């Protein structure tokens, strides 16, 4: 009698900053009862570890040490969402050794579970290239900047829309043109433009694709 191992069912969600991929990933994870990992938080956690110790952000060896000792289950999204940490994270994220260490941790998270939802910039292309379903979530820079602007105001902080828009465009440029794991859709990813979509509409579009992939996965 043959025995076989069923591959984990991984939902890979990629996209630029403020595209809505995180909100969608959390909604999907809740609906299907799947563990969720926001891989962007892993880079923020490394940056915060360096900032907390007053260490330089451009030291790849120190940043890699922080990445290797990171506890994925101890990350606090509320704490890591600070703008300064996001800026610092974009600097450590371009370091190849840091990316390798975090990709390995992210991949282990996905492969150790029967099913999971991961969102980030390179899930479908690098972290989980064999994911059962890949979504690339995007929206126009102006729509994404408006979402980020509204988020900041909702927290009771002040924000400048033009500054947020310029920052997003700069981050897009950096993400798409870095030599290691540039931001791009996987060849087999489903493109989901949420520019004119509500959260519910985006979820229903994703759910239809995931339900089909689940049916195929279960044979």
Curated annotation (Swiss-Prot):
SUPFAM superfamilies in the record: P-loop containing nucleoside triphosphate hydrolases (SSF52540)
Binding site for ATP: 15-23
Catalysis: reaction(s): CMP + ATP = CDP + ADP; dCMP + ATP = dCDP + ADP
Record key words, sorted: ATP-binding, Cytoplasm, Kinase, Nucleotide-binding, Transferase
InterPro entries: Cytidylate_kin, Cytidylate_kinase_dom, P-loop_NTPase
E.C. no: 2.7.4.25
Major localization class: cytoplasm
An example Gene Ontology CC term for this record: cytoplasm
BP-aspect Gene Ontology terms: pyrimidine nucleotide metabolic process
CDD domains (UniProt xref): CMPK
Cellular compartment(s): Cytoplasm
Cited Pfam families: Cytidylate_kin (PF02224)
Molecular-function annotations in GO: ATP binding; CMP kinase activity; dCMP kinase activity
HAMAP family: Cytidyl_kinase_type1
Entry's family note: Belongs to the cytidylate kinase family. Type 1 subfamily.
NCBIfam families per UniProt: cmk
Protein name (record): Cytidylate kinase
Gene source species: Brucella ovis (strain ATCC 25840 / 63/290 / NCTC 10512)
Gene expressing this chain: cmk
């Amino acid at each position: 009698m043959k025995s076989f191992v069923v591959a984990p069912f991984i939902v890979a969600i990629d996209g630029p900053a403020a595209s809505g991929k995180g909100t969608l990933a959390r909604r999907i994870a809740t609906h299907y009862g799947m563990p969720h990992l926001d891989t962007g938080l892993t880079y923020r956690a490394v940056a915060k570890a360096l900032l907390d110790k007053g260490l330089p952000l451009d030291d790849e060896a120190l940043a890699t040490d922080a990445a290797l000792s990171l506890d994925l289950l101890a990350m606090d999204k509320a704490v890591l969402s600070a703008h300064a940490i996001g800026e610092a994270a974009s600097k450590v994220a371009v370091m190849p050794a840091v990316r390798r260490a975090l990709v390995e941790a992210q991949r282990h998270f996905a492969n150790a579970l029967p099913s999971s939802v991961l969102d980030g910039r390179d899930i479908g292309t690098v972290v989980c290239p064999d994911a059962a379903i890949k979504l690339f979530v995007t929206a126009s820079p102006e729509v994404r900047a408006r979402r980020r602007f509204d988020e900041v105001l909702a927290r009771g902080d002040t924000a400048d829309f033009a500054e947020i828009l310029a920052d997003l465009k700069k981050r897009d440029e950096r993400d798409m043109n870095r030599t290691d794991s540039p931001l791009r859709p996987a060849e087999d990813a489903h493109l989901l433009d949420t520019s004119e979509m509500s959260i519910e509409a985006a979820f229903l579009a994703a759910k239809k694709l995931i339900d089909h992939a689940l049916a195929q996965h279960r044979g």
